[in-house]
Amino acid sequence: MEYRIERDTLGEIKVPADKLWAAQTQRSKENFPIGTEQMPLEIVKAFAILKKSAALSNQKLGKLSEEKAEAIVEAADEVIAGKWNEHFPLVVWQTGSGTQSNMNVNEVIANRGNQILKEKGSDVHIHPNDDVNMSQSSNDTFPTALHVACVIAVENHVLPAITKLKETLVEKVTAFEHIIKIGRTHLQDATPLTLGQEISGWHRMLEKTERMIAESNTYMKELAIGGTAVGTGINAHPKFGEMVSEEISQFTGKQFVSAPNKFHALTSHDEVVYTHGALKALAADLMKIANDVRWLASGPRSGLGEIIIPANEPGSSIMPGKVNPTQSEALTMVVAQVMGNDATIGFAASQGNFELNVFKPVIAYNFLQSAHLLADAIVSFNDNCAVGIEADEEVINENVNRSLMLVTALNPHIGYENAAKIAKHAHKEGLTLKEAALQSGLLTEEQFDEIVDPKKMIAPKE
């Protein structure tokens, strides 16, 4: 491998000749050989959006020449397009402010910008600190990139995935609204409801958590940029934060604003905790839905077997003909990961000391992992399971007819204690509920048939 010599304030260091990064990136690469978790490319691209917006703002403020600004913007656009992904090699486990990743972006954009200028015959030189990082600090750029990346992940991936599954569930609610099944509480038989009603509960969960996520995400649209090192805005124009936020908004189509208090924006990540908490709420509901699906599909002959799920792949390497609820299993594993990520984010966000929190990279990594896992898992569950759910009406009807909990309808007519005696007698003697009721002498066959009608038990009545 061929190398070139780069220099920084610590001296000279060898850098691979074909890479756009420079000394500080190389030092980080050598000093932190920890794990395989790379800084998410979403953070890199959010940084590039920020650097582009900063260059345009500094140009408008008369602090950066038009020639340099144009080269920085062009280089940043290439980074955003993914042209230089291999030039961002750093891992998450680095300085807690994300300084090395900020410098990685500064160095790549500066070197690529200089190539662009050279191709145009210019001898102007872009410096990674003085030009690309002008009016900025790692302390305000990393939280800005973090918020931009997380907002995009939530709005472009998580929320559309929820909408897709919601639409499928609405179709199932309508398709199954006539199918009366036995309800279950504590994993025990309860009073009846329709399969459509049961699924409507799932739909409402998604509808509610979707709104919770969207509402919490508004706080993530406050950006730290303009606070520089400790929140005072030293070395930045007073309007810089506002101008950059407007540029980022125009480029992303998201309504970002300059954070009203930069001291808070650098040392606290409560917005991330709040939004990820909403993602955790979604995850909790998805766990419930996935579990319901696999319970209801259990069988085929020794389980509940009230719904049929698509047979996507052989279920066992030893038991032929087995169909497992694999989409539910994948989704519940994602939920477990999200729950763990939430614990990490909550702890990391509690570690702000004085003017800075230095757990930023791990917060970014875990949030983005949660967002993408949830989005992918929801779409997979929808496409490979939910859309193909069918009701086994024969099994459902059999379970309803065998249930002793229909006795609940007798409570207003013969009292709770008498109804309980009938249910216990039926269970002990192996009788149907009707047979036990008639043996009690408390009501006639006509009265029983009139009262114990599942169709009359699925909604309130006067």
Swiss-Prot record:
Cell compartment(s), UniProt: Cytoplasm
GO MF annotation, one: fumarate hydratase activity
Keywords: Cytoplasm, Lyase, Tricarboxylic acid cycle
Entry-linked Gene3D superfamilies: Fumarase/aspartase (C-terminal domain), Fumarase/aspartase (Central domain), Fumarase/aspartase (N-terminal domain)
GO biological process: fumarate metabolic process; malate metabolic process; tricarboxylic acid cycle
Protein family: Belongs to the class-II fumarase/aspartase family. Fumarase subfamily.
Role: Involved in the TCA cycle. Catalyzes the stereospecific interconversion of fumarate to L-malate.
UniProt protein name: Fumarate hydratase class II
The organism of origin for this protein: Bacillus cereus (strain ATCC 14579 / DSM 31 / CCUG 7414 / JCM 2152 / NBRC 15305 / NCIMB 9373 / NCTC 2599 / NRRL B-3711)
Taxonomic path: Bacteria, Bacillati, Bacillota, Bacilli, Bacillales
Gene this protein is translated from: fumC
